[in-house]
Amino acid sequence: MQITDAIADMLTRIRNAGSAKHESVDIPASNLKRSIANILLEEGYIKNFEEISDGKQGVLRVNLKYNNKQNVITGIKRISKPGLRVYAGKDQLPKVLGGLGIAVISTSKGIMTDKKARVEGIGGEVLAFVW
């Protein structure tokens, strides 16, 4: 199956699995998705993730995190889409919920959060908001 927007597919799978109270969700693997999963892990939005080799593309198994039977990820939204790219300079980087959430940014130095991009002093493409 051809997926037009792989990042939106990943975020939707995580959102749906959280709504259905699933323990984990399987996502087709790629370097970009691995980087996004790593950011979600570092920021405490997921328990962990592992890469499962299937002889082809591979699969990322993301284990979701719950707090009192409530999903830790309250909201997850794709911002920059294939039809409408959204870029932000170092001075225009968005804050999600006044700093309580994170923005995932694709920069020239790799995928990082908005906080890290501010420290590095670089802008980039705003991939998603997570809160």
Swiss-Prot record:
Q: Name one GO cellular component term.
A: ribosome
- This chain belongs to the protein called Small ribosomal subunit protein uS8
Q: Which family does it belong to?
A: Belongs to the universal ribosomal protein uS8 family.
Spell out the NCBIfam families in the cross-references.
PRK00136.1 (NF001109)
GO biological processes: translation
Q: Which domain of life is it from?
A: Bacteria
Q: Which GO terms describe its molecular function?
A: rRNA binding; structural constituent of ribosome
Q: Which gene encodes it?
A: rpsH
Sorted alphabetically, which Gene3D superfamilies does this protein's record hold? 3.30.1370.30, 3.30.1490.10
Subunit organization: Part of the 30S ribosomal subunit. Contacts proteins S5 and S12.
Sorted keywords for this record are: Ribonucleoprotein, Ribosomal protein, RNA-binding, rRNA-binding
Summarize the protein's role: One of the primary rRNA binding proteins, it binds directly to 16S rRNA central domain where it helps coordinate assembly of the platform of the 30S subunit.
Q: Name one Pfam family in it.
A: Ribosomal_S8
InterPro entries from the xrefs? Ribosomal_uS8, Ribosomal_uS8_CS, Ribosomal_uS8_sf
